[in-house]
């Protein structure tokens, strides 16, 4: 599923390609690209839920307003997000790439992934996808993109 998300993001979303394709056509295109239909449906569902969060169609998050508050991760979250990932999220909050709401959106979307293996590079891509889909986060998206891509050669770090 994560491979499908990456492919969609790189091929359509990130390149600002016109994505007014119906789901059946997109599914057929992805199947021809070699992806499993179940992974395709899971990825499309993941993106729909991200859009629902972004549009406020899900229940609002109740977050502490205290800037000194520390996020306590659940056991499942610590299994998916290792210390390096959690440290990176904290770093992004400290440099104001993420705020409380976008951090929670990222964690929610990470936990919704159907994958056993997840590392820092995967987290960076999820963060980029979330920031891309949240209005008003253009500067944060640009900062995150700079952290993700090497400016000189364009390769993913």
From Swiss-Prot:
The gene is smg. NCBIfam families: PRK03430.1. It comes from the Bacteria. It holds the Pfam family DUF494. Transmembrane segments: none annotated. This is Protein Smg. Belongs to the Smg family. HAMAP family: Smg (MF_00598).
């Amino acid at each position: 599923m994560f491979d499908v998300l990456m492919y969609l993001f790189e091929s359509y979303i990130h390149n600002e390609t016109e994505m007014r394709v119906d789901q059946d056509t997109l599914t057929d295109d992805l199947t021809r690209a070699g992806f499993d239909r179940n992974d395709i449906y899971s990825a499309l569902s993941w993106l729909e839920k991200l859009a629902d969060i972004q549009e406020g169609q899900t229940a609002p998050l109740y977050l502490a307003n205290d800037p000194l508050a520390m996020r306590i991760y659940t056991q499942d979250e610590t299994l998916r997000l290792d210390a390096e990932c959690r440290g990176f999220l904290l770093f992004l909050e400290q440099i104001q790439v993420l705020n409380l709401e976008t951090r929670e959106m990222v964690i929610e979307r990470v936990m919704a992934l159907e994958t056993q293996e997840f590392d820092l590079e995967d987290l960076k891509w999820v963060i980029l996808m979330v920031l891309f889909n949240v209005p008003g986060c253009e500067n944060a998206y640009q900062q995150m993109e700079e952290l993700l891509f090497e400016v000189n050669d364009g390769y993913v770090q």
